[in-house]
Amino acid sequence: MEFANKLVLNSGFVFDYTNMLGEGRIKTEDLQEMETAMQKARDAVNEMRSSGTAYNHLSKDGTPEPVYFTRLPEIKNGNPNTPVSLQKLKDFGDYLRTNVDAVVFLGVGGSYLGNKVLFDIGAGPSWNSMGEKRRNGYPRIYFSGNNLDAGQCEEIMNELRYWSVHAWPKKKRFKVMLVPISKSGSTLETLASFIYFYEACNKSVMFDTEVTAVTDRNPEAGSPLF
């Protein structure tokens, strides 16, 4: 095994590991001992990318579950993102922009963090404090359900009430969309938060409420959200 102290990709990305090698640091012998394991890991990643299968990656029922996240950047039929699916998302975004005042995403783990990361990158912490013009008409965005935090739910609900009062001269009802995200449809934290917001919004004359559930659409799965 030979090392050039630098890895250069065609994209121009350069990883310089010169200072990682040497006395008191990583030795060539250390990496040589790991070569077989690294080759095995490389083969597993290549298999996952080509077939969508990963060793011992199972659903809750014990059956193999496909792993397709490596295909997300490639927009084509047969991949998670297709021209048709992306157009649906764009149409959905246009609908939210023109019809919805606030969106509350409800999920645990990846169902929570995936959207939250995109929000933090694209919008930032001051988004919900901006006026409609600065938000270019897009709704305010909130996240809940990552844990059973009644205080956090109440804080978001109070903020929705605040904005609904300030929107009253412009429109009779403040439109809220709830988006519970759970493949099984039975995630406790997600359902608890969803029920809280759904009941709180429907009890008030200030709100119109819509629900868009992200869940398993297979009737045999029996998702309560479907």
Please state what every model-predicted region is.
Residues M1-R97:
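Extended, charge-enriched "interface" segments that sit outside catalytic cores
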Residues D94-F226:
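Glycine-rich phosphate-binding loops that contact phosphosugars or nucleotide phosphates
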